[in-house]
Curated annotation (Swiss-Prot):
Protein name: Respiratory growth induced protein 1
InterPro entries with a match to the protein in the record: RGI1, RGI1_sf
Xref: Gene3D superfamilies: Respiratory growth induced protein 1
Membrane association type: Peripheral membrane protein
Family the UniProt entry places it in: Belongs to the RGI1 family.
Record-level GO BP terms: energy reserve metabolic process
Compartments, as annotated in UniProt: Cell membrane
Disulphide bridges, residue numbers: none
A Pfam family assignment: RGI1
Gene symbol of the encoding locus: RGI1
Provenance organism: Vanderwaltozyma polyspora (strain ATCC 22028 / DSM 70294 / BCRC 21397 / CBS 2163 / NBRC 10782 / NRRL Y-8283 / UCD 57-17)
Superkingdom field: Eukaryota
Function according to Swiss-Prot or TrEMBL: Involved in the control of energetic metabolism and significantly contribute to cell fitness, especially under respiratory growth conditions.
Keyword annotations: Cell membrane, Membrane
Length: 164
């Protein structure tokens, strides 16, 4: 038997507008990236990442086998939506704050957009790290057709003019 290949599940894409976008498939690797991004890189205040993953509670229920995930685990299930919202509010945002080493982030700019196709939770806040202010925006989307969650993470530097 061969060992399972543990290569990082990340792809770097350059959009038509020239923006660099990192796409992750694993929550732990995304969190590791955030932690190392603030430690190692000067571009921590200008990052755009996307993550597509199954929430831990879904994988736990399916015994860590994506093939066993129920078809009912989607945005039409009240139980799934409730558990996903708890996962985002109590775990994901907290882990992002810890990875960024910014315990003062409160993500007080919250909104929820809901339609038949999907539910989107938006979170935003401003932070400061190494005397540089930036805006952080997180968008979490669940769709009606499967349990996969899309997370969009973006930081934008704030200049003195944009703060005033």
């Amino acid at each position: 038997m061969t060992k399972k290949d543990k290569k990082p599940k990340v792809a770097t894409i350059t959009t038509k507008s020239g923006e660099t976008l990192k796409v992750f498939e694993d929550l732990a690797q995304f969190e590791d990236f955030l932690k190392h991004e603030t430690e190692d890189d000067d571009d921590f205040d200008n990052v755009h990442c996307q993550l597509k993953y199954y929430p831990p509670f879904v994988l736990h229920e399916a015994h860590d086998d994506p093939e066993k995930i129920k078809d009912t685990a989607n945005s039409h299930s009240k139980k799934y939506v409730r558990h996903l919202h708890q996962h985002v509010e109590k775990h994901l945002l907290k882990e992002i704050k810890e990875a960024l080493q910014l315990p003062d982030l409160k993500f007080k700019d919250k909104s929820k957009d809901e339609d038949f196709e999907k539910i989107v939770w938006n979170y935003g806040d401003t932070g400061e790290f190494h005397d540089r202010k930036f805006r952080i925006s997180i968008s979490v989307t669940c769709k009606h057709d499967d349990a996969m969650v899309d997370l969009d993470y973006k930081t934008v530097p704030l200049t003195e003019e944009s703060v005033i």
